[in-house]
């Protein structure tokens, strides 16, 4: 099972323009194997809100994508930050702190025995989580 990082969701947002390796990988894996962290939802929500402040039309497109595609597509497969994830995340910060959001995504994957799918492999390496880069 795979937890998709924000950059993977963004890449697949417009399949015709997505990198061919990312498209091929996504097509080869059963949709039921794709999960997202609640932190990824936070990141795409934040991005949409920030863009909407500068460009209402683009913000509306992103809102439609989130509400019409992402949330329904991942219904039942959005993993929360619960006590086990919070405790695992805390351990990831000692002795070397890492980005809070990345640590929460990594901790979610570790608790659930999943692989993080991301272009930002280096951001997750220190956590010990299995990572896959579909661009390579």
Feature locations, PLM:
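Residues at the C-termini of beta-strands that transition into short coil/loop
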Residues: 38-39, 82, 120, 135
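Active-site neighborhoods of divalent-metal-dependent phosphate/nucleic-acid chemistry enzymes
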Residues: 33, 46-51, 60, 72-119
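A general structural signal for well-ordered alpha-helical segments in protein cores
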Residues: 19-22, 41, 63, 67, ...
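A generic structural signal for residues located within well-ordered alpha-helices
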Residues: 4, 100-101, 127
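Short, well-structured N-terminal submotif of metal-dependent ribonuclease cores
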Residues: 1-36, 50-67, 136
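Acidic, PIN/NYN-like endoribonuclease modules and their adjacent C-terminal/linker elements
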Residues: 1, 106, 110-136
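A generic structural signal for short hydrophobic patches within well-formed alpha-helices
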Residues: 9, 41-44, 86, 124
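Residues that scaffold the ATP/ADP-binding catalytic core of kinase and kinase-like folds
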Residues: 11-12, 47, 88-89, 127, ...
């Amino acid at each position: 099972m795979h937890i998709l990082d924000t950059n993977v969701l963004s890449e697949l947002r417009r399949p015709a323009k997505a990198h061919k390796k990312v498209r091929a990988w996504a097509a080869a894996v059963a949709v039921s194997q794709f999960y997202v962290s609640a932190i990824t939802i936070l990141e795409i929500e934040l991005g949409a809100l920030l863009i909407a402040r500068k460009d209402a039309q683009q913000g509306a497109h992103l809102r439609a994508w989130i509400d019409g595609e992402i949330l329904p597509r991942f219904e039942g497969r959005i993993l929360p930050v619960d006590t086990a994830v919070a405790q695992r995340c805390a351990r990831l910060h000692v002795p070397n702190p890492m980005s809070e959001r990345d640590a929460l995504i990594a901790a979610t994957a570790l608790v659930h025995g999943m692989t993080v799918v991301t272009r930002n492999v280096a951001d997750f390496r220190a956590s010990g989580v299995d990572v896959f880069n579909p661009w390579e």
